Curated annotation (Swiss-Prot):
Component of the general transcription and DNA repair factor IIH (TFIIH) core complex, which is involved in general and transcription-coupled nucleotide excision repair (NER) of damaged DNA and, when complexed to CAK, in RNA transcription by RNA polymerase II. In NER, TFIIH acts by opening DNA around the lesion to allow the excision of the damaged oligonucleotide and its replacement by a new DNA fragment. In transcription, TFIIH has an essential role in transcription initiation. A zinc finger (C4-type) spans 315-332. Residues 1-37, 61-83, 423-461 are annotated as: Disordered. This is General transcription factor IIH subunit 2. It comes from the Eukaryota. The gene is gtf2h2. It is found in: Nucleus. One of its GO terms (biological process) is nucleotide-excision repair. Component of the 7-subunit TFIIH core complex composed of XPB/repB, XPD/repD, gtf2h1, gtf2h2, gtf2h3, gtf2h4 and gtf2h5, which is active in NER. The core complex associates with the 3-subunit CDK-activating kinase (CAK) module composed of cycH/cyclin H, cdk7 and mnat1 to form the 10-subunit holoenzyme (holo-TFIIH) active in transcription. Keywords: DNA damage, DNA repair, Metal-binding, Nucleus, Repeat, Transcription, Transcription regulation, Zinc, Zinc-finger. Disulfide bonds: none annotated. Pfam families: C1_4 (PF07975), Ssl1 (PF04056). Residues 1-13 have a biased composition (Polar residues).
Amino acid sequence: MSKNIYNNNAQNKRTNRSLYDDEDGPAHVLQTNDEDGTNKYKWENRFEKTWLTIDEDEHGLRPSNQEERNTRNRRLKNKDRDGILSQDQRVRRGMQRHLCLILDLSKTLSNQDLKPSRYQVLLQNVELFIKEFFDQNPISQLSIIITKNSKAEKISELSGNRLRHIQAMKDAIAMEGEPSIQNSLEVALSSLCYVPKYGSREVLFIFSSLTTCDPSSLQKTIQSLKNESIRVSFIHMAAELYICKAIAEQTNGTSKVILNEEHFNESLMLKCQPPPTIGKTEAALVEMGFPQQITSTVPSPCICHEKMKYSGYICPRCGVKSCELPTDCQICNLSLVSSPHLARSYHHLFQIPLFNEVNWKELNKNVTCIGCLSSSEKSILSLFFSCPRCQEIFCLDCDLFIHESLHNCPGCENKLQNTNTNTNGKTNGNEITNGNGNGNGNENENGNGNGNGNGNGNGLH
C-alpha cells in the first residue's frame, strides 16, 4: 500500500513540474513527436540520420544526395576557375606570363587558426601552386619575393625552373617582424619593368598580417604599377586591408579573403588561369627556338649550371647547351621551347564549354559514356553529361578529366576528323590537276565545265 502511494506521489510531482517554466525540466528536454507519439530529446531531433538517405540497388550502395551536390559544386568551381564562357565568346589571354609571387613571412604566420599553422598551410599550397602554374603555363616565368622585418628580398629570379623556386621557398623559413607592402611591390616592379610587353606582368601577394610598415606613401608606387601595366592581386590569410583592396582595384587585380584551408587552395589555383589581357595591348610576334635534345659520348658544359653533362638542348641560334626546357638562352636571349609547351598554353584561348547534365532516368533508357564505355546500369554515381557542341555523352570521371586535364572534347575532335575525311573523299565531276595552259571556259557549281583551250595536264580525278 505504501509503495503505491509513493509511486502516485512521484507521478504527481512529475506532472506538476511540467507546469512550471523550468529550463532544466523535462518539458524543455523532452518533446512529443506527432508522427509516432514517442518522446525524443531535442538533441536527437537536430541530428539528421544521413544513412537513411542512401539508396541501395542490385550492385550495392550508391552515394547519397550530399555527395552528388558536392560533385556538382566541383564542376561549377571548374567553371569559375577556367572562366568558361559560351561557345561564341572568346577572351584574349596572354600565353606568356611573368609572375612575381610575394610571400608574407612575418611573425603572423605562426598563428594556428589554420591547422597545423599558417606557415605549413602556406608552404604546402604554394608548392602545389608552383607545380600547377608551370603545368598549365609552361612557357611562363615566375619569381618569388619574401617580406619580413619591414624589408623585401627576392629569393629566386624570373625563370621556368619549378624545382629552384620550391627549394628557395623552403630555405626561407625564418618568420619574424612586420611585412612591407611598398618594399615588396618596389622589388617586383624592378623585376617586371624589363620584361617584354607582349607578355603579361602580374604580382600575386599572399598577405598574412593586418599591418604594414612602409617607408613612404604608396600612391607613387601604385601609379608606377599602373604605368607599367602590372596587375596586382591579393590573397589574405587574415582580414582584408583597405589599401590592399585599393591597389587591386586600381591595377585590375583581385583581392580575396580565405575561409579555410580548402578555400585557400582554390583561390591559389584560380591564379593558374591566365587573366584577360588589357584591350590596348597590341599583338606581337615572338621569336622562339625549338632545339633538339642531343646526347653525346663526350660531356660538354651547360650554360645554366656550368656543369659537364652528356645530354642537353642546343640553341639553334648560338649553339649553347641548356639542360631543360623551357628557358631563355643566356647568350642570345632566345626563348627555347618545345611544341608540347605551346600546345598546353594554347588551350587557354579556346575553352571547352561546361557540359550539360543528362537526366537519363527520365529518358527511360540506358546511356553509355563514349570515353570509358561505362553504362548507366553499372555506374556508381549515375551522373552523365553531354557536350553542347557534339551532343556526345560522358560520365562524371570523363567530364572532370576533360575539363581539368585533357582540355579537348574527344567527341568534337572525332566529329571534326570525320567531317574532313568525308569532305576530302567526295568529288563531283572531272578535275584536272598539275596542268598548264590557256583557255576560256565556264564552270557550274557541280564542278562540270565547258571550255576551249590548249594545255597539258596530269591527274584526272
